[in-house]
Amino acid sequence: MNTIVPFSHPMYIMLKPAGSLCNLRCKYCYYLEKSKLYDDNKNHVITDALLEKFIKEYIEAQTTPQVLFTWHGGETLMRPISFYRRALELQRYYARGRQIDNSIQTNGILLNDEWCRFFKENNFLVGVSIDGPQEFHDEYRRNAMGKPSFHQVMKGIDLLNKHGVEWNALAVVNDFNADYPLDFYHFFKEIGCRYIQFTPIVERIVKRTDGLTLAPGMQEGGELTDFSVTAEQWGNFLCTIFDEWVHHDVGEYYIQLFDATLANWVGVAPGICTMAKECGHAGVMEYNGDVYSCDHFVYPEHKLGNLSQHTIYEMMNSDRQKDFSKMKYRLLPQQCKECKYQFACHGECPKNRFIRDCYGNPGLNYLCKGYHQFFHHVAPYMDFMKNELENQRPPANVMNQVFGK
């Protein structure tokens, strides 16, 4: 995914202007149930005063001349264009010479000509959630009436292309579509999507007193959901797509995980928190000003505070957030510490670390077997591309090489 990662200092907040409100009811969505944390307020909409406070403090907290705002949901387009026009107005007012960039994630259902013109005119990077061809997409991405959404999403993508809007795809890999990696990959190439983020879905059901049912990471127990991808599926999925990509598409199509893997191979920051040594640089703010450690850790125990009582800088640089950030490395089990590919994934996302390692220690990633398969498979190609980069040659030269298996 062509994500902008401009920060030398970890100060990044994903804003949810409409909370978990959404016009779809995707079976695997981890965020819909977060509305239970705010049952006392059905109007999940950020106020103008809070929006202004956030924009002002967020810009002031940055240490570089470029500032990235990320709008997320729920469904972001359930707020009107007037809301985002107001946000841009506030950004310009408080920018003080800094470059402001905006990215927004949407399911694509509400996209129309007006939205697309707005995104084009204001240089938004649009992320579209789409799970591949219709058969795969409609399996889990349906509305509240149970009706499929694929054709609506494709209409939205056609409009983005019509207006020349830069867009990327976020595709969830689940139990159903993981067995068809090439169908998946070819679909995105056919619709002209050059930046793709494949996200494995792994969720567990637990009983909690706060009404939430999905388990946070770094805790054992719970029943694995039927839509979760297996480690074996994930490994096979990645290896199959990589083989196609590395022989034909390097430099033409960009797959976030492949880029992050190469970055770790070279020894530079991977650009995504899941593959970094430490996480915690990417917080989340809900519509009411509540700030949490991470989008996948929106639970009361990971709440850092509220914008009405604390500044963004205070919360994101608090001891609680620093401890959260260091937890990823500090709690690596022995198997990870001994693994030759630890540098490549650093245990991946703590959310998925809930099984025991070969020594019986807690904290191994549920997808470990799949990632290990992938890293072993791509190692000779990564070594070659690393050498090309170090000698100031394009890594796409790898497509001209033949590697024995």
Feature map (PLM): residue ranges:
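Long, charge-rich, low-complexity alpha-helical segments
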Residues: M1-V5, H186, E338
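Short, ordered coil/turn segments that flank beta-strands lining enzyme active or ligand-binding pockets
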Residues: Y287
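Conserved alpha-helical substructure of the radical SAM core
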Residues: M1-R117, E121-N122
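Conserved AdoMet/S-adenosylmethionine-binding subsite of the radical SAM
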Residues: I55-K56, M78-Q197, R204-V206
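Disulfide-bonded cysteines in secreted/extracellular proteins and peptides
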Residues: C22, C26-C29, C273, C279, ...
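Radical SAM enzyme [4Fe-4S]-AdoMet core and its adjacent flexible, acidic
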Residues: N143-H151, D158, K162-T274, E278, ...
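Flexible mid-to-C-terminal extensions adjoining Fe-S/redox cofactors in radical SAM and related proteins
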Residues: V298-K405
